[in-house]
Amino acid sequence: MVQLRPRASRAPASAEAMVDEGQLASEEEEAEHGLLLGQPSSGAAAEPLEEDEEGDDEFDDEAPEELTFASAQAEAREEERRVRETVRRDKTLLKEKRKRREELFIEQKKRKLLPDTILEKLTTASQTNIKKSPGKVKEVNLQKKNEDCEKGNDSKKVKVQKVQSVSQNKSYLAVRLKDQDLRDSRQQAAQAFIHNSLYGPGTNRTTVNKFLSLANKRLPVKRAAVQFLNNAWGIQKKQNAKRFKRRWMVRKMKTKK
């Protein structure tokens, strides 16, 4: 703090007064310097700093304000109300978005539909067709049938002409079935001769099927045959089974009589 000093008189002062004034000025400068640096100074300047420190200690020692149950309950209710309002706002926003989407969807459907003029034309045309008399409808049906018959006759004529042209162009030959059987028998005899000459008793050759069947027979664990050597075995067994069945049926019928 800066102390105010009394105004000096205009009368000439003594030497002692001048010395006291110099000491006071030096003390005031020291006090100001101490205030700026935050250090206590000597004399009256140190007293206010001590008072400020005591005030800070009192402020630190003060306890926090106590909250009552009613105030805490009011704050909790206020918080719940805020949360409910936010949820309600979110729901309203979602509803508005859905409504907008539905409106846009309806507008797009309307754009895709045909214009009203074309729809009216189609409805009028269908009504006029329904209003026609049954006599006219029968006449139209008869005309269509006649046209179809004429087209069918024309197509039949074209087919007959094609058949005649084919028969005239191509020549057919008659062949007896006996000659065909002789040809088949000759082919079989030729195949048998080739087989005997290649795989006969005087040759050291065997077919693949025979070789595999012999290898399978020599194995300790028998496997399924790759291919049957004689295809007539199954046919003969079937024929024998049929004969046995017939005989058994005849014997049974005789015993019943």
Curated annotation (Swiss-Prot):
Coiled coil: 65-104
Composition-biased stretches (Basic and acidic residues): 75-94
GO molecular function: RNA binding
Bias type Acidic residues, positions: 48-65
Region annotation Disordered: where it falls in the sequence: 1-94
UniProt xrefs under Pfam families: NUC129 (PF08157)
GO biological process terms held by the UniProt record: maturation of SSU-rRNA; ribosomal small subunit biogenesis
Compartments reported by the entry: Nucleus, Nucleolus
Sites of Phosphoserine modification: 133
Compositional bias annotation for Low complexity: 1-25, 34-47
Keyword tags: Coiled coil, Isopeptide bond, Nucleus, Phosphoprotein, Ribosome biogenesis, Ubl conjugation
Cited InterPro entries: NOL7_C
Record's GO cellular component terms: chromosome; mitochondrion; nucleolus; small-subunit processome
Keyword Amino-acid biosynthesis: no
Tissue spec. comment: Expressed in numerous tissues. Particularly prevalent in the adrenal gland, thyroid gland, heart and skeletal muscle.
Per UniProt, location of the Glycyl lysine isopeptide (Lys-Gly) (interchain with G-Cter in SUMO2) cross-link in this chain: 131, 162
Top-level taxon: Eukaryota
Biological function: Functions as part of the small subunit (SSU) processome, first precursor of the small eukaryotic ribosomal subunit that coordinates the first two steps of ribosome biogenesis in transcription of the primary transcript pre-RNA and pre-18S processing. During the assembly of the SSU processome in the nucleolus, many ribosome biogenesis factors, an RNA chaperone and ribosomal proteins associate with the nascent pre-rRNA and work in concert to generate RNA folding, modifications, rearrangements and cleavage as well as targeted degradation of pre-ribosomal RNA by the RNA exosome.
Family (UniProt): Belongs to the UTP16 family.
Quaternary assembly: Part of the small subunit (SSU) processome, composed of more than 70 proteins and the RNA chaperone small nucleolar RNA (snoRNA) U3.
The name this protein goes by in its record: U3 small nucleolar RNA-associated protein NOL7
